[in-house]
């Protein structure tokens, strides 16, 4: 989940490229503007042939309000905040930061050119969600992407192992 222009598509493309040899990945575009949309997304996930997919990714169209308000059935939520958006997003959209488990702070390669305080942003996020995994990345240059991929692989493997045993998190 993220705002338009935060780097969802680039991050998603690089993520799939890095994981495609180890995991079978499905992607669903999800425009969550209402409970009806969330219900349709959840139904789509239920109808997905899970025997063919290890990881299903829901990519929202790009806003920080609606996706946080509705349960899509996602096991984990990750969001992308880009440096050009500003370090005050946690103050403006607290719910989004409360419902996610992982935050990618993207476009760190342009940090020197923006008034973005990375440490202050992290403090604001952790005040809202002390358990948030925060990973600074540049999807364009690849910086930080290994940490993101490792986290996602671990979470995916852990869930798949639990699911095979009939355990729901």
List where the protein language model places each region:
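Residue-level signature of catalytic and energy-coupling elements of molecular machines
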Residues: 31, 59, 106, 121, ...
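Canonical P-loop GTPase G-domain recognition
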Residues: 110-169
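Conserved beta-strand scaffold positions in the cores of enzyme catalytic domains, especially
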Residues: 27, 77, 134-136
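Hydrophobic transmembrane alpha-helix bundles
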Residues: 35-36, 91-101, 150, 169
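Residues at alpha-helix caps and immediate loop-helix transition turns in enzyme cores, especially N-
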Residues: 11, 37, 89-92, 117, ...
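Nucleotide-state-sensitive switch-loop elements of NTP-binding domains
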Residues: 1, 6-73, 86-88, 97
């Amino acid at each position: 989940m993220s705002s338009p222009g935060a780097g969802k598509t680039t991050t998603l493309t690089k993520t799939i490229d890095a994981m495609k040899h180890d995991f079978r990945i499905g992607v669903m575009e999800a425009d969550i503007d209402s409970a009806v949309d969330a219900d349709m997304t959840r139904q789509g996930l239920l109808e997905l042939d899970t025997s063919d997919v290890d990881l299903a990714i829901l990519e929202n169209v790009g806003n920080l309000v609606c996706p946080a308000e509705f349960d899509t059935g996602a096991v984990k939520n990750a969001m992308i905040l880009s440096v050009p958006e500003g370090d005050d997003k946690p103050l403006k959209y607290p719910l989004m930061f409360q419902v996610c488990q992982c935050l990618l702070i993207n476009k760190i390669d342009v940090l020197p050119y923006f008034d973005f305080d990375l440490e202050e942003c992290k403090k604001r996020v952790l005040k809202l969600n002390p358990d948030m995994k925060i990973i600074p990345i540049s999807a364009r240059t690849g910086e930080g992407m290994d940490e993101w991929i490792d986290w996602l692989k671990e979470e995916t493997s852990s869930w798949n192992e639990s699911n095979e045993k009939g355990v729901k998190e």
